[in-house]
Amino acid sequence: MAFDKDAFLTALDSMTVLELNDLVKAIEEKFGVSAAAMAAPAAAGGGGAAAAAEEKTEFNVVLLEAGANKVSVIKAVREITGLGLKEAKDLVDGAPKNVKEAAPKADADAAKKKLEDAGAKVELK
């Protein structure tokens, strides 16, 4: 029995949501495909914003918490920012705070590593 396109669409039109769900599952099993994979290309059409997010060149280095070795973290903050002792201590005590803003990726990674080596919890945004 051969189905033409119109007969197939008419049959689909008469199916309930549960029957359509079963049909989709059967197609996934039979042909080894996923319904989620079929939806992905449609989402890629609006990928301009996603591409811009992936190409981010400036990052904020955010100190989440100082950790156990607060003195080392204060020293690291002073090295990264050039702040005085009191300002660096206030920044560390006020965590979460931005240590560095709009830094290039290399500088942000270096600052993050230096702070993490001192015992701080750090995030790049």
From Swiss-Prot:
InterPro entries: Ribosomal_bL12 (IPR000206), Ribosomal_bL12_C (IPR013823), Ribosomal_bL12_C/ClpS-like (IPR014719), Ribosomal_bL12_oligo (IPR008932), Ribosomal_bL12_oligo_N_sf (IPR036235). Signal peptide: none annotated. Keywords: Ribonucleoprotein, Ribosomal protein. One of its GO terms (biological process) is translation. It holds the Pfam family Ribosomal_L12. GO terms for cellular component: cytosolic large ribosomal subunit. One of its GO terms (molecular function) is structural constituent of ribosome. Homodimer. Part of the ribosomal stalk of the 50S ribosomal subunit. Forms a multimeric L10(L12)X complex, where L10 forms an elongated spine to which 2 to 4 L12 dimers bind in a sequential fashion. Binds GTP-bound translation factors. This is Large ribosomal subunit protein bL12. The gene is rplL.
